[in-house]
Amino acid sequence: MRRAETIAEIRAAVRELRYRENPRLKGETWGTRSIGFVPTMGALHEGHLSLVRAAKAECDAVVASIFVNPTQFGPNEDFGKYPRTVEADCALLEREGVDAVFLPQVEEMYPAGATTWVEVEELSGRLDGASRPGHFRGVATVVAKLFHIVGPDRAYFGQKDAAQVANLRRMVRDLDFDLEVVVCPIVREADGLAMSSRNRYLSVEERRQGLVLSRALRAMEAGHAAGERDGRRLLAAGASVMAEEPAVRVDYLRVVDPETLVDVEAVSGPALATVAAYVGATRLIDNVLLGETPAAFKL
């Protein structure tokens, strides 16, 4: 696995990967190879590795990135303590057969004097964007830069970050990026907790409390499966479960359109039940799709 720390190095690595011998092309020995891209902030777990495996299955070569992006953290958030386990992460990526990994420093991605931002208006202020002002502007900016630098054919993201996915899909469409955003299902621990790099912040008791998020979503999912289509009643079912853990502070509990993130009052098509809550000092998010999987979330 090739490790690149500069933009020039990763571009050279991708160029070599794209034009290397391609056994998938019948009757030819050389030709353009497809590139799958998995951008991460590191502290990798099985959720990230599921994205790598999906990319490996669909693309000729896979590139990953590890970059803790400062512009998507607020002033009182966990940028300083976000887990940084680069060597362990690289070992996992190499084991999974990743071809190259981009490991830039902040100065490489945001050189002195940089003043350009990318923001998806309206969407960037919904769900997580409402409680974390500037978060999705930071996400869209760094991902746009990574797409421009790597130039992948497909980029892989997890459904757990559904609001991020909605922002990035709109950005890709509006700015005419020539790539496909692929969304992979949430990977959960055996007890139902959605995998997250931030789970390592939780104490044993907080981890137990955090299970209320997935329980609330399952209650909403069960209500929908039983025929309930009133968004307010579905929310009430979820809120009732969340109340079982009074120490958990709910940021939001919503039923929304998965593409626009607008609240859905009457569920007549695909919808997303989504929750964010603070367990101790740790903010957790989770979601579940209601009804048929929308096109935006299909593999």
Swiss-Prot record:
<keyword id="KW-0436">Ligase</keyword>
<comment type="pathway">
    <text>Cofactor biosynthesis; (R)-pantothenate biosynthesis; (R)-pantothenate from (R)-pantoate and beta-alanine: step 1/1.</text>
</comment>
<comment type="function">
    <text>Catalyzes the condensation of pantoate with beta-alanine in an ATP-dependent reaction via a pantoyl-adenylate intermediate.</text>
</comment>
<feature type="binding site">
    <location>
        <position position="187"/>
    </location>
    <ligand>
        <name>ATP</name>
    </ligand>
</feature>
<keyword id="KW-0566">Pantothenate biosynthesis</keyword>
<dbReference type="GO" id="GO:0005829">
    <property type="term" value="C:cytosol"/>
</dbReference>
<dbReference type="InterPro" id="IPR004821">
    <property type="entry name" value="Cyt_trans-like"/>
</dbReference>
<dbReference type="GO" id="GO:0005524">
    <property type="term" value="F:ATP binding"/>
</dbReference>
<keyword id="KW-0547">Nucleotide-binding</keyword>
<feature type="binding site">
    <location>
        <position position="72"/>
    </location>
    <ligand>
        <name>(R)-pantoate</name>
    </ligand>
</feature>
<feature type="active site" description="Proton donor">
    <location>
        <position position="48"/>
    </location>
</feature>
<feature type="binding site">
    <location>
        <position position="164"/>
    </location>
    <ligand>
        <name>(R)-pantoate</name>
    </ligand>
</feature>
<dbReference type="InterPro" id="IPR014729">
    <property type="entry name" value="Rossmann-like_a/b/a_fold"/>
</dbReference>
<feature type="binding site">
    <location>
        <begin position="41"/>
        <end position="48"/>
    </location>
    <ligand>
        <name>ATP</name>
    </ligand>
</feature>
<dbReference type="InterPro" id="IPR042176">
    <property type="entry name" value="Pantoate_ligase_C"/>
</dbReference>
<dbReference type="GO" id="GO:0015940">
    <property type="term" value="P:pantothenate biosynthetic process"/>
</dbReference>
<feature type="binding site">
    <location>
        <begin position="195"/>
        <end position="198"/>
    </location>
    <ligand>
        <name>ATP</name>
    </ligand>
</feature>
<dbReference type="Pfam" id="PF02569">
    <property type="entry name" value="Pantoate_ligase"/>
</dbReference>
<comment type="subunit">
    <text>Homodimer.</text>
</comment>
<feature type="binding site">
    <location>
        <position position="72"/>
    </location>
    <ligand>
        <name>beta-alanine</name>
    </ligand>
</feature>
<keyword id="KW-0963">Cytoplasm</keyword>
<keyword id="KW-0067">ATP-binding</keyword>
<feature type="binding site">
    <location>
        <begin position="158"/>
        <end position="161"/>
    </location>
    <ligand>
        <name>ATP</name>
    </ligand>
</feature>
<protein>
    <recommendedName>
        <fullName>Pantothenate synthetase</fullName>
        <ecNumber>6.3.2.1</ecNumber>
    </recommendedName>
</protein>
<comment type="similarity">
    <text>Belongs to the pantothenate synthetase family.</text>
</comment>
<dbReference type="GO" id="GO:0004592">
    <property type="term" value="F:pantoate-beta-alanine ligase activity"/>
</dbReference>
<dbReference type="InterPro" id="IPR003721">
    <property type="entry name" value="Pantoate_ligase"/>
</dbReference>
